[in-house]
Each structure stands twice: as structure tokens, then as C-alpha cells.
A protein has these predicted regions:
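Beta-sheet-rich non-transmembrane sensory/scaffold domains
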Residues: 1-478
Length: 478
């Protein structure tokens, strides 16, 4: 079988949101599992609070799921529900659904499926009733280890699980933050941490002992013109983490970012000030190759807000911007964001990335090492330059990772010491791989531009790379 996900592009929406299996020889479709619950799903249907079935949406746009051939379970991640806000999905009533799971199933969930028929075996919802377009899709890493979470390192632990017991785990990190360990046999919650940092602005307010998650309702933007900072935001997006069996640890690339979000206000009026100001700093990257020119992102209506924010040109700081375009938004320290609204009067919705309050700009990004048995986290490597590429671990205890300032490096898997580094012509992107030919091991890395590259480069104030730097670079290990 070939298993694949969909991005909800059809009409009606709900019917086009599914994971499907096809016969690998004939291409015949064998089954579908709908990731936005329909009327024929008694548990999932009720979780939508009466929202019209045809308009429900929750896709699997990200990386593919994982398969356990021994247990015969497909484990797959589902993204946020759309429209992005609770009020927009529920006729202006953000309370039409609960603040705890389940809400708007199977959005922001991990689902376990029977590969023979696509039937749901279990689900776990990481973020119920999302209000901010935070995706919990992308990779699920399957591993087996003992359950020994350190109470000093792990905030949320299931007390009913016997310590020291061996568990078949599925571990994942959401775009909005949070590292979750589940039992992949039944979806039971094991433990979770508010990755990459614990903050009162974290999007999940609590997790009950049995694993039920609660959205941080203090940060819901359901009043016209209301403004909040929500953490985190694209903290671990479309760049895979890796698992080192010898260290029993994940190596997670992350960005210490939050979301400065303001709801639309059709009546216009004054725009609330940023919740806090961000110091404008420069991340010093390596010099550009001689004779090249920086590729300055061009977008209509770009402009800097407080702290050097740069929106995507959609969504003005002022009222009545034609087509929703205008300055980079009123948010500070942002990038990769901007407003959503259309033309006419009023203030459109605005979404702008912003560094976490009180964070160190010289430690804006990095690689974290997390022991999957104990949950202990070590910030292995920190830098001012964010990345848009995967980590890769090797049996020789190296971790390869690159950043948007064009640095590609190998660090020690134990202490984070940089053992080797080079500068490439372009920014490092997904995904770094290793392979061998005739006994010789090679590392291959991709450079170019990604969906969030320009925004993060602007936000970190990195010298943009030269244009036309798409390429694949291969290095031989000694």
C-alpha cells in the first residue's frame, strides 16, 4: 500500500480532508480516513459544536506519518482547523466548543490507524480548538524506551504509568511548541514538556494527569481588535528532528519565536500597542562571496514595525488599507506573518512573529537534546541565526545542522562542541541525509529558499544570501 495525506483543497472542504491508502501495483484507492470529522463519526462530529459539516477542515499538509510494521499501526499528524480562529469557525462564538480536548477533531492531533482498512484505532489531541493557526502535523518518531520522566525536567506526567516500564512511544513536537510522548499502541499520554520554553504565554495552559489538554483561553483573540502574544510559533516547523538510539535522545532544531496576533476590527479605530518591545539586533553571518549581491526579499507593502518587525505585506497597521496591504504590521520584532484581511474599512487581522519576551537574541535558535526516557533537556547548541533545515545524527556521535546564515556544521552529540564547519553559497534547507557508496560515507545537504526563510532572515537581521543559490552539496566523511 501507499499511504498519503491531503490538504483539504476540494469542495466541500470536509470531504477533501483525508488520509488515503492506494494499491501500490494498480493505484486503486483502498480506503480513506477523514481528518476533519463528519456526521458519521459520533465522537468527532460532536466535537465541532454543531459547525456545518461541509465547511470543516483539518489537513495533513506536512511530513508523512510513520508505520510500525510489528504492531501494524499507522501514526500520522494532523494540522490546525480552518478558518484559523475559533470564532470564524463557529459563527462568531468561540465558546461553541470547549476549552479542553476534544474540540474540532481531528485537528492538531496524532491519529493511530489500522493499515488494512483505515479505521481509527486511537487519537490524541495536542491542542484543542486552535485559535492561532498552530500545526501539530509533521513527523512522528517511533521508538521503544523505558518510562522514567524526571519530575524536575518534565512538567506533565501520567502518574498511572509504571515507572521503569518499557513503552512503544510516538514522540512529536508541534509548530506551536510542546514535546509529547505517547504510547503508540493505544495513544495513551505518557509525558510532555512546554518545549522550547515554559512561559505564561504558552498556548497550552495545562495537561491533566490523564493527558487531556487545555487551550490557554487567556490568549484567545475573540474580541475585535484584541491583541495577544502566543508562544510558541513556528518553533519547529517543516524541519525534521532526529533520534540517536545510542544516546536515547532527540536532537531538535528550534526557533525561540512567538506569535503577535491581533484580531480583525471592522470598525477600525486605534491599534493596541505591542505587548512588549523587542531590541533590534544584528546576527553577524559570514561574508558573502565576492561579487555577489544580497537577495533582498521584494514584497509589496513591506515595512518595519517596532523592533524591526517585517510582515509579509498583507495587513496594514492602519485602517482601510486597499487589499489589506500596507506596512509590516504593528507587531514588534516580527517576520513571517502579517495581516489576513481584505480591503475596505477597518483593521484586518494581523499575525507577526516576535521573539519571546526576555529572550536572548544571541540565542534565538539552536539544537536541543532531549532524553526520551527522562525528558531531560539540554540546549546543546545556541546561535543568533535560525535554521530551516533538519538535524542529522550519525553513529559516530555527530549532529549535522545548518542555518540561514549559510553555516553548515557538525557538532558533538554530547556537549555541542563544533567539530567542523563550512560556509555554503545559500541558506541550508530541508533535509540533510547520509548515505554510503563502496564503504565511503557521505553527507548531502540542500540550499535555497523556503517558505519561512525570508521572514526569519529579516527577523534575525541576517545578511540575505545571494540570489539563485539552490543546490545540493555533498561532503565525504574521513
Amino acid at each position: 500500500k501507499i499511504i498519503s495525506g491531503r490538504t483539504c483543497g476540494g469542495n466541500p472542504r470536509q470531504a477533501s480532508c483525508y488520509i488515503a491508502a492506494h494499491d501500490a501495483r494498480t493505484g486503486k484507492e483502498l480506503w480513506r480516513f477523514h481528518t476533519a470529522a463528519g456526521a458519521d463519526d459520533p465522537i468527532g462530529d460532536k466535537s465541532w459544536g454543531g459547525a456545518p459539516v461541509d465547511g470543516r477542515s483539518a489537513s495533513t499538509w506536512g511530513l508523512t506519518g510513520s508505520y510500525d510494521p510489528v504492531k501494524k499501526i499507522i501514526v500520522w499528524g494532523v494540522a490546525n482547523p480552518t478558518p484559523n480562529t475559533r470564532a470564524a469557525r463557529h459563527g462568531g462564538n468561540s465558546n461553541a466548543i470547549g476549552m479542553s480536548a476534544p474540540a474540532d477533531l481531528y485537528s492538531n492531533s496524532t491519529v493511530g490507524l489500522n493499515p488494512e482498512n483505515g479505521k481509527l484505532l486511537w487519537y490524541y489531541q495536542h491542542l484543542p480548538g486552535d485559535d492561532w493557526d498552530q500545526d501539530y502535523t509533521n513527523e512522528r518518531i517511533l521508538l521503544r524506551t523505558s518510562f522514567n520522566p524526571d519530575t524536575k525536567a518534565v512538567k506533565w506526567i501520567n502518574p498511572s504509568i509504571q515507572r521503569g516500564s518499557q513503552r512503544d512511544m510516538s514522540v512529536s513536537v508541534g509548530e506551536g511548541g510542546g514535546l509529547f510522548a505517547l504510547d503508540r499502541n493505544d495513544g495513551k499520554f505518557l509525558w510532555a514538556i512546554p518545549f522550547p520554553y515554559d512561559t505564561p504565554r504558552f498556548l497550552i495552559s495545562r495537561i491533566d494527569p490523564d493527558g487531556k489538554t487545555w487551550i490557554n483561553e487567556d490568549l484567545i483573540v475573540d474580541i475585535p481588535g484584541e491583541r495577544h502574544v502566543i508562544c510558541s510559533y513556528n518553533t519547529k516547523s517543516y524541519w525534521p528532528m532526529s533520534y540517536h538510539p545510542g544516546k536515547n535522545s532527540l536532537y531538535i532544531p528550534y526557533v525561540d519565536n512567538c506569535l503577535d496576533m491581533r484580531s480583525a476590527n471592522p470598525a477600525g479605530g486605534p491599534i493596541p500597542p505591542p505587548p512588549y518591545e523587542i531590541e533590534r539586533t544584528t546576527c553577524q553571518g559570514p561574508p558573502l562571496p565576492a561579487g555577489t549581491e544580497a537577495a533582498v526579499p521584494a514584497a509589496a507593502g513591506r515595512g518595519a514595525g517596532p523592533g524591526g518587525a517585517a510582515g509579509d505585506g498583507r495587513g496594514a497597521a492602519g485602517a482601510g488599507a486597499p487589499g489589506g496591504r500596507g506596512g509590516g504590521g504593528a507587531g514588534g520584532g516580527g517576520a513571517a506573518g502579517g495581516g489576513r484581511g481584505g480591503g475596505g474599512g477597518g483593521n484586518p487581522e494581523s499575525r507577526t512573529a516576535i521573539r519571546r519576551e526576555g529572550s536572548d537574541p544571541q540565542k534565538f535558535a539552536g539544537v536541543a537534546k532531549v532524553n526520551v526516557s527522562t525528558g531531560e533537556l539540554t540546549r546543546l547548541f545556541e546561535t543568533c541565526s535560525p535554521g530551516n533545515g533538519a538535524t542529522l545524527t550519525t553513529g559516530g556521535d555527530l549532529v549535522f545542522w545548518g542555518d540561514l546564515a549559510r553555516n553548515f556544521r557538525a557538532i558533538d552529540a554530547d556537549n555541542g562542541k563544533v567539530l567542523w564547519q563550512t560556509v555554503l553559497p545559500g541558506s541550508i534547507q530541508n533535509s540533510t541525509i547520509t548515505y554510503a557508496v563502496n564503504g565511503k560515507q557521505y553527507i548531502a545537504v540542500l540550499t535555497g529558499r523556503g517558505a519561512v526563510t525570508s521572514g526569519l532572515i529579516t527577523q534575525a537581521n541576517i545578511q540575505p544570501p545571494p540570489p539563485n543559490t539552490n543546490g545540493i552539496f555533498v561532503f565525504a566523511l574521513p
